[in-house]
Amino acid sequence: MLLNRDDLIKARAGYKKALDAQKKKILVCAGTGCVAGGALEIHAELIRLIEASGAVCQVSLEKEPHSGVVGVKKSGCHGFCEMGPLVRIEPQGWLYIKVQPQDCAQIIEESILGERLVERLAYKADDRIYPTQEEIPFYKKQTRLVLDHCGHIDATSIREYLAIGGYAALEKALFDMSADEIVKEIEESNLRGRGGGGYPAGRKWAQVSRQKSPVKYIVCNGDEGDPGAFMDRSVMEGDPHGMLEGMMIAGIACGASEGYIYVRAEYPLAVSRLETAIVQAREYGLLGRNILGTGRDFDIKISKGAGAFVCGEGSALTASIEGKRGMPRVKPPRTVEQGLFAKPTVLNNVETFANVPQIIRKGAAWYRSVGPEKSPGTKAFALTGNIEHTGLVEVPMGTPLREVIFDIGGGIRGGAGFKAVQIGGPSGGCLTKEHLDLPLDFDSLKKAGAMIGSGGLVVMDEHTCMVEVARFFMNFTQNESCGKCVPCREGTKRMREILERIVAGQGEAGDIDMLLELADTVSSTALCGLGKTAAFPVVSTIKNFRDEYEAHVMEKRCPTKTCQKLKQIIIEPGLCRGCSKCARVCPVGAIAGKIKEPFAIDAAKCIKCGACIEACAFKAVKED
């Protein structure tokens, strides 16, 4: 256990020497995606082969440095998820993609023993080999601050976190700054909450610090519920100590002695890594009573949620931690006044807390130098959808959407045309190619009718039906509605019913205007922020793709030929040989005709399964 500041400084220096002594390191991505692809088997095989070669393999960082050892580590997410499982070789910085256990022998023989690049495992594009991670276009335009440690250290080791300067910000906050100075530093940095609306974190901390209550709480929102979003999960898995350090600093600044991390149970790896980090921090005297001999107490507990989307809302989240049903309540009072257990509470999300140690260590002015003035810093995004390179990216606020999608993401998969990007999850909106040069910051997106939200970016190509996209998100929101307020409970249900009729070819004149009217009512009268933003995907798709809605309603036609019930399958008489094969495979008997004469489809019976299209050898059956 570290008893004082000197102990912490000595431990950090000792572990740094031990880490520097590992002249060769193998970092196996052990994020959820790569683990699913076999990363743990790769890690075990690398250890076995190194030991078999006679070299000294070091899995856990020792207290004392040892020369000539090869460090083999399970790191956090590297971000290039499309190419996993990933293995990074240091000190060269080589990144190997799509690694399998059978590749390990060549990696050891050539890269560790022979110090040569295994070219077949390196990333290739445009007839060029990109040996190092830093050279790969996916990484080249990123600025990784929050994700800086992910992929570079053992995510389960407090020793490695200390070795790279970990808990230096906590040390500074404990010994060199007053509570007011910490709050002022966060205020001056203009760090805005990374979980949704972008409320200034420093302002929230100041409000809680001014409360006279003897009991206060720090709560981290790790309930990442947006479809396709995995930024917070990756931070919790890859750099848990960084997030814990941010929470500890918030506790010192606001006078809180207890913190909670609310994380969904569907994130078992994140929960496991957090539990390990908390135990380690307690063992080292960085959590608990009398931290580093200062007389300050602060401890953290984990509360696992059951996956309800509405529990991402502040008052619903605190209710869930208390053991109640997760339902939003009327405000005021707000969480800064009466939050968890009716006490003043700082509630920020994972990425917000992960920014704090760097701000305290390097200063508010440094932080404001990254990104635009009103939205400084970086933002992590989960890049998914019809894009060449899906994964986790981090860019400075204000980076144009085009740069993220085309320069980092590699553009649209298969050479198709870009159509839209859904940003902000179910509470966000769809942006079009006219918005590609829009800077990704809170204010610019709000003006465009969207929001950053937690940071999900779902890219859609020209074959995507925007009416179906709106129906998908409305179905999600309606299913996740807590049902407490009528506007959200009933309004989203009516909107979903209208959208389902439209994609089924049963749309009526006036449906589009009714959707907009319902959207306005729900947005202006719903109880919580989730209800107020529930209609954003519908409003933005109508605004930007009204012609698609009109085609569905007025012409009973889906322009992208995506909506199953709007498909029309026909038989071209000039191509039909009358072989009857299509009629024989039709499961509902919708095709009839005479042998050696053109057959015909009864549109009323046809279920659009497409079996006849696959069966026809003459390509006479096709979608109209």
Residue ranges and their predicted role:
Residues 83-87, 487-493, 581-600, 611-624:
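Iron-sulfur cluster-binding cysteine motifs and their immediate structural context
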Residues 122-188, 342, 348-363:
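Flexible inter-domain linker/hinge segments
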Residues 377-389, 395-397, 401, 559-603, ...:
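C-terminal accessory/binding modules appended to enzymatic or scaffolding proteins
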